[in-house]
Amino acid sequence: VILRGQIFDIERFRPTESGETASPLSPEELDEYTYLVAGSVGEFWTRICCQHILGYTSKSLEDLLPVARRFGQALQLVNILRDRRSDADIGRVYIPDQRFYAEMEHVGELLTAGDEYTASVVPRMLRAACLLPLDLARRTLALVAEHPLGERVKVPRYIVWFALIRAMIFKEEIQIDLIREKQ
């Protein structure tokens, strides 16, 4: 599946002899692309963890797979939004400017799947491993929102370290907060 996503990317954005760039992805193509390169990864690791880690989740595999898919897609969409100018410079326009705000809203909705997924992970260290990319994605998205013209943004290294420590130390408290918010 991941290879299909990479092939899709290469073929879709192949340079033409005339030097024209490909049109931006449609919302449907973007959904397919983010599934192929990231949503499928969420499904894959969820299957592996459910099969090999006793008590991995409080949900059934059937219920968790669509959540894993959306969580993976959300993380990829954050990267696409973050890199949209540098990607455009090399002829890859995943999201046209006129859809920027709609996709910012959409990725915010998709990230709630990360909350749901993380809340369902039982082993504390694995829960922390889910919290870290979720936290960094939200921080990155906030920076992207502050720079809507597409300037390259990056979460500072000290914030990354802070997020790592926060995920490791406060994993139970964060989970309790997430569960309370859902009720």
What annotation goes with each model-predicted range?
Residues 1-74, 81-183:
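Catalytic cores of Mg2+-dependent Asp-rich isoprenoid enzymes
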